[in-house]
């Protein structure tokens, strides 16, 4: 998720830990569905961690790290509601078959589905997002992903600690799955 308004995502995080969502995830081979926060809403979730459900698994960085996070192949859906979801992620999402949903027209991206948020329809929106994420995971879980492509993405990451952490993870994945590529890591981690 990316944006500024944690309140919009509160119902979603509660829905993600429901038995119904868990069953949907398990039906396609996932262990569950998690929220990875980027940008301001990720920081907000991090600050409110004690009030969050287990669906929130952490803050991955600001809007400039979104491209690196997407290029890992671990993300199955981008959900945004404000303009800090930077333009430029569209080609990455297209190449990795990651659907995008925007809840506000300020966040609308090329090739993204626009679904205006409505408090009255929050449950339906959350269910739709869950179904879309599950379908994306099911379609992507066995796809090949060439870890060599990540080296180019890492060259643009400015923070040395972040670059080192991502490189370490990618090297571990490469060792486990061979030099030719790897499958979506979420297939193993849920």
State each model region's role.
Residues 1-190:
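Metallocofactor- and cofactor-centric catalytic cores in central/energy metabolism, strongly enriched
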């Amino acid at each position: 998720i990316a944006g500024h308004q944690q309140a919009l995502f509160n119902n979603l995080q509660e829905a993600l830990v429901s038995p119904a969502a868990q069953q949907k995830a398990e039906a396609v081979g996932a262990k569950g569905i998690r929220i990875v926060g980027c940008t301001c809403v990720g920081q907000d979730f991090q600050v409110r961690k004690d009030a969050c459900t287990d669906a929130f698994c952490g803050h991955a960085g600001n809007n400039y790290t979104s491209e690196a996070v997407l290029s890992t192949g671990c993300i199955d859906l981008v959900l945004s509601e404000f303009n800090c979801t930077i333009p430029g992620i569209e080609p990455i999402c297209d190449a990795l078959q990651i659907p995008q949903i925007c809840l506000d027209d300020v966040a609308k991206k090329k090739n993204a589905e626009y679904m205006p948020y409505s408090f009255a329809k929050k449950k339906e929106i959350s269910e739709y997002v869950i179904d879309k994420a599950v379908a994306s995971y099911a379609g992507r879980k066995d796809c090949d992903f060439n870890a060599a492509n990540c080296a180019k993405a890492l060259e643009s990451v400015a923070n040395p600690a972040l670059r080192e952490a991502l490189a370490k993870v990618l090297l571990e994945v490469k060792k486990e799955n061979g030099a030719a590529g790897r499958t979506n890591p979420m297939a193993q981690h849920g």
